[in-house]
Amino acid sequence: MNLKSASQLTLYGLNDHFNELVSLYKKKKLPNKILLSGNKGIGKCTLAYHLINFILSNDEEFPYDEKNFTINENNKSFKLTINNVNPNFNLIDVASDKKFIDISQIRNLILNLNKSSLNKKPRFVLIDNIEYLNKNSINSLLKFLEEPNDNIYFLLIHNNKRILSTLKSRCLNFKIHLTNSQSAEVLNCILKKKILNNINNELIDYYFTPGKILELINFSNDYEIELENLTLKNFLRILIEKNYYKKNIFGKALLFDLIESFLQKKEFHIQSNLFEYFITKINDVKKFNLDDEIIINEFHEKVLNE
């Protein structure tokens, strides 16, 4: 199942947000520094790609279908974008072999933007996971954002993690939110079936955005894990005891997400003084790139096997 935001032809659930941004653009009031903030997997990046295609395809063949919130796969700008050769589009994200967005990525971006444009169309910079900008990357980006940038739009994707206030203050913040019922509707549209009937409600309650559930489904299919009657606690046991979290990058991210969800359960929070301890340890592992095996084994022993 293809989960890449760039190739999602139809926008689901975020139509009102899209219309608001399009309305600002048509009135020539669209800010050139926009922060799209919300839970990871909610569709912020997909929304950004649709807005970009709407603008770039406006004077091209097979333009964006505004009525049905759909990108035409035959559109020139769409083809250039998914093949990473669109001169009017720059994507910045964490490299597969890195844990943070490196300053070299920002420097190369600035060099590219300082070059003359090949056409008169707007240019777009999409920075995903901006919470992974390191200090040097942020400082370099801030200097460029302070300068006048005619016809260049920055769309920054923020996953509700803490970011530098100086970066946040330079952008107009659009908060993206979906209710559980809206998320369920989005999933049903994408999958063409009611897949949530096959997932334990406890997992849904603690892991519920469309993108995250889709990743969870893919992961469970890869390792033949039945989710229908699986509690959150037992799922954590399986991930750790069978070392599934070591199989790929998503597996480890999934494990830490679910550990945090489990720790934030009200009954656990009240009854255990380990809550703050493990949350602090997990944050330190992520922030300082520490050995995560120690904290995972400790969590398994002190919490899951209590």
Where are these regions (language model features)?
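Charged, glycine-rich active-site and insertion segments that engage polyanionic ligands
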Residues: 1-54, 60-81, 150-152, 160-306
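Flexible beta-alpha connector loops of hexameric P-loop NTPases
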Residues: 96-103, 174
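Structural recognition of the conserved hydrophobic beta-strand(s) that form the central parallel beta-sheet
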Residues: 124-128, 141, 152-158
